[in-house]
């Protein structure tokens, strides 16, 4: 993505827009309004127009947005022509699910290797992805791998993150409950499924539709 000073909330919505625009293009649709986008991605149209305004004139009043132009724009903005190579650390139930999934709908993101300590898993392939011993982490991680998915037990998450900090990894998607401390040059996104579920239940009880 281009280094533009846009709000982080906007940046998080860009892949959502891109996915829907891809589907529109595949269906043969030539143009789309902000209202149609709003209905599809469940983001209000005013927010969509504001998000798009950070990138200049992407559409025309009374016409909407040209689908092919948007597709090309977001493809370039999100660096979809560059392959993002990913390593996964922790081949438990969640990690195994990731290996089988391997971002099949996102052709530019690929898990290329996994790490674990289980003798039953080390030396095997899961979903076509080789599983190495965690002791080989620094040796195996090449300069091409800049993103890691962390699905290890929370008790070892920080120590693994410390080791990743000594490699070329610049981004960690953390699925453990641990809140990690790393250097400023590494960006971490925390996804705690238990917290997400608790939040959903709270909203269901306190903000009924």
From Swiss-Prot:
<keyword id="KW-0804">Transcription</keyword>
<dbReference type="GO" id="GO:0003677">
    <property type="term" value="F:DNA binding"/>
</dbReference>
<dbReference type="Pfam" id="PF02629">
    <property type="entry name" value="CoA_binding"/>
</dbReference>
<keyword id="KW-0678">Repressor</keyword>
<dbReference type="InterPro" id="IPR036388">
    <property type="entry name" value="WH-like_DNA-bd_sf"/>
</dbReference>
<dbReference type="GO" id="GO:0005737">
    <property type="term" value="C:cytoplasm"/>
</dbReference>
<keyword id="KW-0805">Transcription regulation</keyword>
<keyword id="KW-0963">Cytoplasm</keyword>
<dbReference type="Pfam" id="PF06971">
    <property type="entry name" value="Put_DNA-bind_N"/>
</dbReference>
<protein>
    <recommendedName>
        <fullName>Redox-sensing transcriptional repressor Rex</fullName>
    </recommendedName>
</protein>
<dbReference type="GO" id="GO:0051775">
    <property type="term" value="P:response to redox state"/>
</dbReference>
<dbReference type="InterPro" id="IPR036291">
    <property type="entry name" value="NAD(P)-bd_dom_sf"/>
</dbReference>
<dbReference type="GO" id="GO:0045892">
    <property type="term" value="P:negative regulation of DNA-templated transcription"/>
</dbReference>
<feature type="binding site">
    <location>
        <begin position="90"/>
        <end position="95"/>
    </location>
    <ligand>
        <name>NAD(+)</name>
    </ligand>
</feature>
<dbReference type="InterPro" id="IPR022876">
    <property type="entry name" value="Tscrpt_rep_Rex"/>
</dbReference>
<dbReference type="GO" id="GO:0003700">
    <property type="term" value="F:DNA-binding transcription factor activity"/>
</dbReference>
<feature type="DNA-binding region" description="H-T-H motif">
    <location>
        <begin position="16"/>
        <end position="55"/>
    </location>
</feature>
<comment type="similarity">
    <text>Belongs to the transcriptional regulatory Rex family.</text>
</comment>
<keyword id="KW-0238">DNA-binding</keyword>
<comment type="subunit">
    <text>Homodimer.</text>
</comment>
<dbReference type="InterPro" id="IPR009718">
    <property type="entry name" value="Rex_DNA-bd_C_dom"/>
</dbReference>
<dbReference type="InterPro" id="IPR036390">
    <property type="entry name" value="WH_DNA-bd_sf"/>
</dbReference>
<keyword id="KW-0520">NAD</keyword>
<dbReference type="InterPro" id="IPR003781">
    <property type="entry name" value="CoA-bd"/>
</dbReference>
<comment type="function">
    <text>Modulates transcription in response to changes in cellular NADH/NAD(+) redox state.</text>
</comment>
């Amino acid at each position: 993505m281009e280094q533009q000073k846009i709000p982080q909330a906007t940046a998080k919505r860009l892949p959502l827009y891109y996915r829907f625009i891809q589907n529109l293009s595949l269906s043969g649709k030539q143009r789309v309004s902000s209202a149609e986008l709003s209905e599809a991605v469940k983001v209000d149209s005013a927010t969509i127009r504001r998000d798009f305004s950070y990138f200049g004139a992407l559409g025309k009043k009374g016409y909407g947005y040209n689908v092919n132009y948007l597709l090309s724009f977001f493809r370039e903005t999100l660096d979809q022509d560059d392959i993002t190579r990913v390593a996964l650390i922790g081949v438990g139930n969640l990690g195994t699910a990731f290996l089988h999934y391997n971002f099949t709908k996102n052709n530019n993101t690929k898990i290329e290797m996994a790490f674990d300590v289980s003798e039953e898993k080390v030396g095997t392939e899961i979903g076509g992805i080789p599983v190495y011993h965690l002791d080989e982490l620094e040796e195996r991680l090449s300069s091409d791998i800049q993103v890691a998915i962390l699905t290890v037990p929370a008790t070892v998450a920080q120590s693994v993150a410390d080791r990743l900090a000594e490699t070329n990894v610049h981004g960690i998607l953390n699925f453990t409950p641990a809140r990690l401390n790393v250097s400023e040059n590494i960006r971490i996104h925390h996804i705690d499924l238990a917290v997400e579920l608790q939040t959903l239940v709270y909203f269901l009880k306190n903000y009924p539709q």
